Amino acid sequence: MDSYFTLQSNIEASGEFLDRKSRFIAQLVHIESEDEANAFIEMVRKRHYDARHNVPAWILADGRERQSDDGEPSRTSGMPTLEVLRGAELKNVCCVVTRYFGGTLLGPGGLVRAYTAATQAAVAAAQEAGQIVEMTSVVPVDVHVAYPQYEQVLRLAQDSGAKVADTDYADTVTIHLVFKAGEQEPFCAKMRELMAGREEIEVGAPEFAEF
């Protein structure tokens, strides 16, 4: 997987759906782990302690995912919520749909439609607010060069598709670069050729970040 979409950190998107006086409130956040998902689920349960159901679903970038019907009939709530997240190609997100019962049974089909609609509303709200971001597999590369070579190396890096994250000026110049995974290799080869073996390059481990 080279990239995926997720919700911005420290954001909670929400959406609502009403059907025959039952109120469905979808709450969507970014997570990095199962523990973070569980913590958010527990927080929502405390927030809506008086609700009939708090239905959770979450997906991690490593492929793990989980959902629960939280007392609703089997596969009428948690799975529809999860399917919306899958359909939006979201990873590292957790959605909890709270239901306040309105006194009328909606039936399996009605429940599927309601939980789907509430989750879709939360995803749409995040999209409209520009809160959905693409996370790309990137590789950090630190280059240490003498001052006379700085401009030349900077141009080479930018021509090679790098983004400059930061620059440190000391006895030498350290340029902190970020490449899409795989694009750092041609740059490193050109650096070895350009500097005739005198280059100092530190290549970090791949990670996911906005690029």
Tell me what each language-model feature is:
Residues D142-K163:
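Short amphipathic alpha-helix segments
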Residues V112-V138:
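Long, charge-dense
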Residues L177-Q184:
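Terminal, non-globular segments
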Residues V164-Y169, M195-F211:
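Conserved short beta-strand edge segments in small beta-sheet-based binding/regulatory domains
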Residues I59, K91-G102:
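Glycine- and acidic-rich phosphate- and metal-coordinating loops
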Residues Q131-Q149, I175-L177:
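Short glycine-/aliphatic-rich beta-strand segments at the starts of folded cytosolic domains
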Residues V153-Q158, F187-M195:
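Short amphipathic alpha-helices in soluble, non-transmembrane regions
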Residues M1-T76, A189, E202-F211:
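C-terminal regulatory domains involved in ligand/effector binding and gene-expression control
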